[in-house]
Amino acid sequence: MTNLRKTHPLMKIINHSFIDLPAPSNISAWWNFGSLLGICLTIQIMTGLFLAMHYTSDTSTAFSSVAHICRDVNYGWLIRNLHANGASMFFMCLFLHVGRGLYYGSYMYKETWNIGVILLLTVMATAFVGYVLPWGQMSFWGATVITNLLSAIPYIGTTLVEWIWGGFSVDKATLTRFFAFHFILPFIITALVIVHLLFLHETGSNNPSGINSNSDKIPFHPYYTIKDMLGLVLMLLSLLTLSLFSPDLLGDPDNFSPANPLNTPPHIKPEWYFLFAYAILRSIPNKLGGVLALLASILILLIIPLLHTSKQRSLMFRPISQTLFWLLTANLLTLTWIGGQPVEQPFIIIGQLASIIYFLLIMVFMPLAGLLENYMLKPKW
């Protein structure tokens, strides 16, 4: 009798995706983040579902319903802290996953990469609408500032903003629809993840060398299941440490005050994972220009495959491009720092320089470095 795992229509799909999947023998721990992101998504959907059972999406009760979850619901404080900090872990894994893709040339699998960029945008949208739900000061003003950016769109901008708000300001209608969006988007993300994996399994995984590994494959289970479990333990340990010892470390103190449309917080800023984009937005002293730069900072990922000039796929054997990659990393950390600072000197000029360097590195210096490295590989005699 043949193995049920290999014949049953449903089990067969799982088997080909997670058990008998041929994987390169040399993929490093940087390839763990895909599975970690899957775990993050699962944790977020589960904790989110339990929070939704007790949350009310009404301006008069939203803030107190979150307080009620933390005080009166069994382990409500834990569920809420896991959900809030789980979002941070999600973005940490996402940024490392994208960074891995950039470093090792994984973007050459264009369909997988493009679906990945769409996934990144969808997760960012989900996190944004989710941050509005507790209806604290930063929730309210964050929603006001970010939705207001759409008014920069010529001709239809103002109408579009009022349509999204469901009125003439961020109010009850906005909160209700944001809750609806926040509930549905994770399921859309799950569907996109399946498509992402579908395209990935058409080609198989890339590997650190960037060389075709068809001649040397090993089964995913047990080799990479056990390796992924190590990553999982480390991530869960980090998440639990953060959620149990310092749950409010990454949050904003202003969000402990209920939303008040008559009182603007001194510094409006998003969660840490949006600060780099927020810094780019603020670095341009023009509303439409800032919005376009903000969009470009993320959408630039879509043209990365077109900017690949090197004969080698990975940066593993390309020291000049490696240096530029780590400069880009440092630059993004600088932007993250600037996004959390007030709009005054010297932060303004640092933010503007970092924004220019960000686009220059990706669009000019890295493609040129690829060409230079190609030239250096040619025999000169």
Curated annotation (Swiss-Prot):
The keyword Metal-binding applies. Heme b b562 binds at residues 83, 182. Its main location: mitochondrion. One of its GO terms (biological process) is mitochondrial electron transport, ubiquinol to cytochrome c. It is a multi-pass membrane protein. Keywords: Electron transport, Heme, Iron, Membrane, Metal-binding, Mitochondrion, Mitochondrion inner membrane, Respiratory chain, Transmembrane, Transmembrane helix, Transport, Ubiquinone. Signal peptide: none annotated. Binds 2 heme b groups non-covalently. InterPro entries: Cyt_b/b6_C (IPR005798), Cyt_b/b6_C_sf (IPR036150), Cyt_b/b6_N (IPR005797), Cytb/b6-like_sf (IPR027387), Cytochrome_b (IPR030689), Cytochrome_b_C_euk/bac (IPR048260), Cytochrome_b_N_euk/bac (IPR048259), Di-haem_cyt_TM (IPR016174). The keyword Membrane applies. A ubiquinone binds at residue 201. One of its GO terms (cellular component) is mitochondrial inner membrane. Its cofactor is heme b. Heme 1 (or BL or b562) is low-potential and absorbs at about 562 nm, and heme 2 (or BH or b566) is high-potential and absorbs at about 566 nm. Belongs to the cytochrome b family. Component of the ubiquinol-cytochrome c reductase complex (complex III or cytochrome b-c1 complex) that is part of the mitochondrial respiratory chain. The b-c1 complex mediates electron transfer from ubiquinol to cytochrome c. Contributes to the generation of a proton gradient across the mitochondrial membrane that is then used for ATP synthesis. The cytochrome bc1 complex contains 11 subunits: 3 respiratory subunits (MT-CYB, CYC1 and UQCRFS1), 2 core proteins (UQCRC1 and UQCRC2) and 6 low-molecular weight proteins (UQCRH/QCR6, UQCRB/QCR7, UQCRQ/QCR8, UQCR10/QCR9, UQCR11/QCR10 and a cleavage product of UQCRFS1). This cytochrome bc1 complex then forms a dimer. This is Cytochrome b. It comes from Distoechurus pennatus. The gene is MT-CYB.
